[in-house]
Regions:
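N-terminal, positively charged/glycine-rich alpha-helical extensions of SAM-dependent methyltransferases
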Residues: 2-48
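Conserved alpha-helix/loop element of class I SAM-dependent methyltransferases that forms part
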Residues: 53-75
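Short, conserved loop/helix-junction motifs that constitute active-site signature segments
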Residues: 73, 92, 200-203
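Conserved class I S-adenosyl-L-methionine
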Residues: 76-84, 100
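Residues at the starts of beta-strands that form the adenosine-phosphate
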Residues: 77, 97-98, 206-207
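Receiver (REC) domain switch-region micro-motif
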Residues: 78, 181, 186
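Class I SAM-dependent methyltransferase SAM/SAH-binding core
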Residues: 87-168
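S-adenosyl-L-methionine-dependent methyltransferase catalytic module, highlighting the catalytic core
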Residues: 136-144, 166-173, 178, 182, ...
Length: 294
């Protein structure tokens, strides 16, 4: 998809295959930028078809084709687990999908490596940020606040639920299951990736798409092993598996068939400092692409 306007904006990068999101708001550029300033941390970059840009850690639109989503998303029910700033949820909805997203209440729910190293992360329940029409109290961390800013700006209808990856179950969504379950760059940040995949499987009617780090193919015999990323330095990274290990994760979670032979590029755009570690978060990387089926 190409931008509708030929006007060039200084922060807009040129990319032949870039995916531009639709700007469905009445806000002018100044109003848009002022609303975006309400959020201090953007995990995803937003490049719109009218030239408006909000830059974040990662520019998904530049490498979107690598995820190999179904070509037709209209009418599908999609669950985006760990939506972050909500780029994928926005794209899914603009393609006609029925979108549900989840994210944690705050950093108190993150799987932190050495939690006592981060005294600023409270273990207490945070104050709710808002209430929904059905009375549910909603909480969000700086990572997911961007979703709410864009939801308000664009008028998105995506349903939001507070939940850790391990808490996903049909009962959370009124016994609903989803045609497609998406877990983008999440598994490496979890202590128990198998448990999270089991939870995802419980609400998956057809297909799971996920990405994660993987040990090189030349790892010893490509045995089903995983390495702890104790030296990652970001406080939220845990495991790097071999390809054989990813296969065992998926089988253990209940998926019957899968393809884990492809990769996706995650490109840094405008790195922010992580709100927990205060280190720059954006590092371009190649991740293993997982397509799994129930």
């Amino acid at each position: 998809m190409k931008p509708k306007s030929n006007k060039q904006f200084p922060s807009q990068k040129s990319a032949e295959n870039r995916v531009y999101l639709k700007f469905t708001s009445h806000l002018n550029e100044t109003e848009f930028r002022n609303r975006c300033k309400e959020n201090e941390y953007w995990y995803h970059s937003y490049y719109f078809d009218n030239g408006f840009v909000q830059r974040g850690d990662y520019d998904i639109g530049q490498d979107f084709e690598g995820y190999q989503f179904p070509s037709e998303l209209s009418g599908m029910s999609i669950l985006d687990i760990g939506t972050g700033s909500g780029w994928f949820a926005t794209y899914f909805e603009q393609q006609g999908a029925d979108v549900t997203v989840t994210d944690v209440r705050g950093y108190c729910d993150f799987d932190l490596f050495g939690r006592d190293r981060y005294p600023n992360v409270s273990t207490e329940k945070p104050a709710p940020e808002r209430k929904l029409a059905d009375g549910r109290e909603i909480y969000y961390s700086p990572v997911s606040q961007g979703f709410w800013v864009m939801k308000d700006i664009l008028g998105l209808k995506a349903q939001y639920y507070n939940a850790r990856a391990y808490d996903i179950c049909p009962e959370l969504f009124g016994d609903k299951k989803f045609d497609l379950v998406f877990m983008g760059s999440l598994l490496m940040h979890l202590r128990d990736p198998i448990g999270a995949l089991m939870a995802a499987h419980s609400v998956c009617k057809h297909m799971l798409i996920a990405t994660t780090y993987m040990l090189p193919d030349h790892s010893p015999l490509n045995e089903p092993i995983m390495k702890m990323r104790e030296n990652a330095g970001d406080g939220i990274s845990w495991w790097i598996p071999t390809q054989a290990c990813i296969a065992q994760w998926l089988l253990a979670a209940g998926f019957k068939t899968f393809n884990i032979d492809n990769h996706v590029r995650l490109t840094t755009d405008s790195p922010y400092k992580h709100p927990i570690t205060e280190k720059s978060t954006g590092v371009s990387q190649t991740q293993q692409l997982i397509h799994a089926y129930v």
